From Swiss-Prot:
One Gene Ontology cellular component: cytoplasm
Residues recorded with modification O-(phosphoribosyl dephospho-coenzyme A)serine: 25
Pfam families found in the cross-reference section: ACP
Species: Pseudomonas syringae pv. syringae (strain B728a)
Superkingdom of the organism of origin: Bacteria
Function of the protein: Subunit of malonate decarboxylase, it is an acyl carrier protein to which acetyl and malonyl thioester residues are bound via a 2'-(5''-phosphoribosyl)-3'-dephospho-CoA prosthetic group and turn over during the catalytic mechanism.
Post-translational modification: Covalently binds the prosthetic group of malonate decarboxylase.
NCBIfam families, sorted: malonate_delta, PRK01220.1
A molecular function GO annotation: acyl carrier activity
Compartments it resides in: Cytoplasm
Keywords recorded for this protein, A-Z: Cytoplasm, Phosphoprotein
Keyword Phosphoprotein: yes
Entry protein name: Malonate decarboxylase acyl carrier protein
Amino acid sequence: METLSFEFPAGQPPKGRALVGVVGSGDLEVLLEPGKPGTLSIQVVTSVNGAALRWQHLFERMFDGQTPPALSIDIHDFGATPGVVRMRLEQGFEEIGHD
């Protein structure tokens, strides 16, 4: 198991929170909570050692050219593909966008 941390510039925190995915069902669980204004912080706990660059590139592609909301995101990964990770993050962003 490896724990990775990432930070990106962000806007204001949202009011909502979201939990998407279930670790036991497939490989990934993502918890999104309001964060510190101006900062998107992501903590990944993964069963795949040595994948920090893969995660970094995935997040950079997702947030390139946009300002995400200020969030604290916890990801529990057990070998999900980058496509599944992106889908779960997009589901979480969609969920927090609704009151």
